[in-house]
Regions:
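Conserved ATP-dependent adenylate/AMP-binding module captured primarily in the ANL superfamily
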Residues: 1-9
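Conserved C-terminal helical docking segment of ANL/AMP-forming enzymes
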Residues: 196, 209-214, 232-269
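Adenylate-forming AMP-binding core of the ANL superfamily, especially NRPS adenylation
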Residues: 44, 66, 79-80, 85-148, ...
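Active-site glycine/GP-rich loop and adjacent strand/helix microenvironment
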Residues: 41, 50-51, 69, 75-78, ...
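Conserved ATP-binding/catalytic segment of the ANL
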Residues: 117, 125-192, 196-199, 208
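Conserved C-terminal "lid"/linker of ANL adenylate-forming enzymes
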Residues: 190, 216-218, 250-293
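C-terminal boundary motif of the adenylate-forming
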Residues: 120-122, 169-171, 208-233, 261-263
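Gly/Ser/Thr-rich phosphate-binding loop
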Residues: 8-13, 22-94, 107
Length: 293
């Protein structure tokens, strides 16, 4: 009602907020013609949400999904229509979430993944286009240090002459159009022998199931066993036919090379998420729970 009563033209919100609003509007056949610009950030934006906007917004309303962090915002941006027309189908097949091209003034690189401090920038750190690596950014608005946290500053900043690169703590890759594809948090990757599984590409496969609200990849047994935890859209289904539901999900995973090694499915009624955006999944809490299952 405030959007309609005050004829709001611009809005910023998390994917969870807009998922709730858009579901209500579609169900109640409500359109929001005053909106001209919407920014959605805080977590990857589901394709189902972007498609739903077609039913409630005017065609000229721009829906932007910028990518960034507290230390560096914005970094890249992409508009809804480009996602729906060009990248969404690839995201659903597990390529990651396309977050667009760097904004003016920001320089991005993809480097080989490391959990250690990098003492200085070297050209050999960068990896070829198309490979998943660690995302780093250089821009005038990026924070230089963490207050009284020299250890964190050393771990997240790469000196480069008189400037520096900031390590986003995320993994991703470039496509042929020089767009960035987000593949999850670096610390959430699951390493099994010579194979590394990344959260966003893996979860996208299981999220295609109509009875899945969202999913989370975690590692059990000291990160050696990959597990997909499902928050069901229909909680009754888990109670009634858990075995068939699990079989359907495992078949989905087996159909794609990057999820073929996932053999364990668990169900969790309501995922723990961050208070601010109500969208970031606390995978660490889910991983701790999975250890006891």
């Amino acid at each position: 009602h405030p959007i309609q009563n005050y004829r709001i033209s611009s809005s910023f919100g998390s994917p969870t907020l807009w998922d709730t609003v858009s579901r209500y509007c579609q169900k109640s056949k409500i359109r929001l013609p005053s909106l001209r610009r919407i920014l959605i950030a805080g977590a990857p934006v589901p394709g189902t949400l972007l498609k739903r906007f077609e039913f409630i917004l005017e065609p000229d309303c721009k829906v932007l999904t910028p990518y960034g962090a507290t230390e560096a915002l914005p970094v890249t941006s992409i508009e809804r229509q480009e996602i729906v027309d060009d990248t969404l189908a690839r995201s659903e097949k597990g390529e990651g979430t396309c977050v667009g091209k760097p904004v003016p003034g920001a320089e991005l690189k993809i480097i080989r993944i490391s959990d250690e401090p990098i003492p200085k920038w070297e050209e050999g750190l960068e990896i070829p286009k198309g490979q998943i690596g660690e995302i780093i950014v250089k821009a005038p608005w990026v924070t230089k240090t963490y207050f009284n946290r020299e250890d964190v500053t050393r771990l997240t900043k790469i000196p480069d002459g008189k400037t520096f690169w900031h390590r986003m703590g995320d993994v991703g890759k470039w496509d042929k159009q020089n767009r960035l594809w987000f593949c999850g948090r670096k610390c959430h990757r699951v390493i099994i022998g010579l194979e590394t599984l990344f959260t966003i590409p893996c979860e996208a496969i299981f999220n295609q199931h109509t009875d899945v609200k969202r999913s989370a990849l975690v590692g059990k047994s000291s990160n050696r066993e990959p597990v997909i935890i499902i928050e069901p859209e229909n909680k009754d289904r888990v109670a009634k036919d858990r075995e068939i539901f699990t079989k359907e999900l495992l078949e989905l995973g087996a159909a794609h090379p990057h999820t073929r090694s996932i053999k364990k499915i668990l169900f969790y009624p309501d995922f723990p998420v961050d208070v601010r955006h109500n969208a970031k999944i606390f995978r660490e809490k889910l991983a701790a729970w999975a250890e006891s299952q």
